[in-house]
Amino acid sequence: MSLHDLLPGKLGFGTAPLGNMFRDIPEAEARATVDAAWNDGIRYFDNAPFYGAGLAEIRMGDALADKPRDAYVISTKVGRLVLDEVEDVSARDLGEKGEVFKYGRPNRIVNDYSYDATLRSIDDSLARLKTDRIEIAWVHDVAQDFYGDEWLAMFESARTGAFRALDRLRDEGVIKAWGLGVNRVEPIELLLDLEGLRPDGFLLAGRYTLLDHSRALQRVMPKVAERGLGIVVGGPYSSGALVGGPNFEYAPATPAILDKVARIKTLADRHGISMKAAGLQFVLANPAVAAVIPGASRPERIAEDRAALRETVPTDFWRELREAGLIDRQAPVPGDG
């Protein structure tokens, strides 16, 4: 099923912050954030067992428990099982994401992309989310940022396990769509080139943004559009760097990134627009993009995101970005064509 048809609106909600990403978020604040998203009209919520070792899914399930199930769409991820046993979270080996979720639940997380583990993961997520169905399942993080030189072996495990399981679940009507949920372009390229598999789309985080988009633009977006698939873009603010935060790719931003942000902001200020408007509207200008899912850990962020989509961004802003070499000249922008 096309993600463009399945997803209810262009703005969704990424729940990673609700897993206590970077900080310990009080329950009341987490609930207020989900309520703000719902009251704003957002009806697509992306989750993952990895986010706080199930914490984000639990919070989302509690917040949506009294909402009509046919009114919203849920995606979650497979590839990580959350066990009942606990562990020292500081001892976890989580690749580039390091201690991002050190304030989450202490339950042990194991990487497992096998067929049986995929079925178990879906069942576990259904329980945490307090729902009877999940519309979209993403295979999570089969990429270099987590597995280094072993990523191809993990991808092969997913090819023979998770991909087959999700194909079956979709054919049986348990889910409506599946694909990869990754922070790198290469796994998507690889899956698109495989025969015999029929993904419905992809969740690509941090790789189609104002700050980093060239490889995705050249290698993924055209194929996705040609096949009638869709991309959900996560991390449109590049871990917060685009909107003045200190991090890029879950780590302190480099001087080069900070300089690029400053140059973009100079142009945005000149035209009287917010950096959020620039970031979100750039992403959604690509016809392959079905939705964008900024993460939010505070209620006020929801209103900011919605307002950013409504801002009028002058065409001269995009032209000046291109002329300054701050975006790829081939990247679609609002008003093209």
Range-by-range predicted roles:
Residues M1-R92:
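N-terminal binding-site loop/beta-alpha segment at the start of enzyme catalytic domains
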Residues F13, A30, F45, M60, ...:
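Conserved, mostly hydrophobic/aromatic
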Residues D24-A37, S114-R128, R184-L192:
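Short, acidic/polar
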Residues E29, V139-G337:
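Beta/alpha (TIM)-barrel catalytic core signal, keyed to glycine-rich beta->alpha loops juxtaposed to Asp/Glu
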Residues M1-D5, E57-V73, T118-R133, L217-G230:
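Short amphipathic alpha-helices and their capping/turn segments at secondary-structure boundaries
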Residues L7-L11, G41-R43, P68-Y72, T131-E135, ...:
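Short, well-ordered coil/turn segments that N-cap beta-strands
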